């Protein structure tokens, strides 16, 4: 999903600020549905084992459009034999309880909540418009709703971060006890 609440200063992925595209979301999902229809027909005999919804930030879609996206996937693909069905829930400022509920109503087996760091000064510096407390809130909501496989993404080498900042982040993430932890090193490059 090529939309985000805003563009993080370090990001090299192609994404568009959702606020500029809200009037085009129905058109985007209609085009995506045609692509899903074509792909499901072309791969009819292929027993896929994984679905991965990435971005951008899929949860930058509002609840209605997120539900529509997930329902289209259910309609066009056999999800009964999947080994993994992941959605990048993404940035805590785009995750709501209602969106988590929508995800839970589908056979999603893994979500990724991506704080990148647990240091507020760094979050502010890199253009992430959420608070550390938001990370704890959405993680708790996801557990409350019964998500049993939660990944968290971190980035090492963010501007101004010291070894002590990284230790703090790791200590805070360890307290949450995610099922998976993905650690990236910052790599500044041109948009993909």
Please give the residue ranges for each predicted region.
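Local cysteine-cluster metal-coordination motifs and their immediate loop/turn environment
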Residues: 2-15
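Conserved non-cysteine loop/helix-boundary elements of the Radical SAM core domain that shape
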Residues: 15-42, 46-192
């Amino acid at each position: 999903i090529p939309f985000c609440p805003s563009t993080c200063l370090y990001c090299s992925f192609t994404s568009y600020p959702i606020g500029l595209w809200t009037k085009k979301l129905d058109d985007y999902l209609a085009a995506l549905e045609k692509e899903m229809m074509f792909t499901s027909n072309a791969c009819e005999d292929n027993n896929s084992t994984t679905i991965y919804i990435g971005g951008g930030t899929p949860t930058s879609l509002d609840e209605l459009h997120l539900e529509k996206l997930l329902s289209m996937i259910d309609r066009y693909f056999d999800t009964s034999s999947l080994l993994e069905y992941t959605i990048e829930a993404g940035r805590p400022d785009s995750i709501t309880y209602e969106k988590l509920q929508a995800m839970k109503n589908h056979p999603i087996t893994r979500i990724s909540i991506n704080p990148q760091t647990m240091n507020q000064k760094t979050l502010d510096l890199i253009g992430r418009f959420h608070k550390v407390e938001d990370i704890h809130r959405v993680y708790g909501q996801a557990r409350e709703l019964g998500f049993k496989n939660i990944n968290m993404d971190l980035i090492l080498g963010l501007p101004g971060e010291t070894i002590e900042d990284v230790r703090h982040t790791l200590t805070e993430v360890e307290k949450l006890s995610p099922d998976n932890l993905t650690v990236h090193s910052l790599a500044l490059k041109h948009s993909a």
